[in-house]
């Protein structure tokens, strides 16, 4: 496991096990609506889009304009893409496109 060992604990395991049971987008909306604030969910969604745009080669100013993300957020995501645990890979736009049609993503 390449994740930070400080993150691993029974409560986080329980959270992830719960997430892994979700089967539909609607179930995800319902779960995350109850679990997160709107801002927390928007922030996570924004970071995923920043990662997608960085993978596509977009520059910081374009990403900032398109997503509203700060340069600090963009830098953090870029650092995760380069030096992180590859956590964005399974949910990256490129990976999702290999498994779904674009109309399924929008």
Where are these regions (language model features)?
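Short, solvent-exposed alpha-helical "recognition" segments
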Residues: 79-91
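General nucleic-acid-binding
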Residues: 1-20
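Short, amphipathic alpha-helical "recognition" segments used to contact nucleic acids or chromatin
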Residues: 45-57
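Short alpha-helical "recognition helix" segments of helix-turn-helix
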Residues: 63-65
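Short, Lys/Arg-enriched anionic-surface-contact patches
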Residues: 27-46
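Conserved small/polar residues in nucleotide/adenosyl-binding loops
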Residues: 94-101
């Amino acid at each position: 496991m390449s994740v930070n060992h400080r993150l691993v604990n029974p409560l986080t395991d329980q959270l992830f096990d719960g997430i892994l049971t979700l089967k539909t987008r609607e179930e995800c909306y319902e779960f995350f609506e109850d679990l997160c604030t709107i801002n927390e969910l928007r922030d996570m969604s924004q970071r995923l889009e920043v990662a997608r745009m960085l993978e596509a080669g977009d520059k910081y100013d374009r990403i900032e304009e398109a997503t509203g993300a700060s340069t600090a957020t963009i830098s953090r995501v870029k650092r995760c893409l380069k030096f992180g645990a590859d956590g964005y890979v399974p949910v990256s736009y490129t990976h999702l496109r290999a498994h779904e049609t674009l109309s399924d993503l929008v």
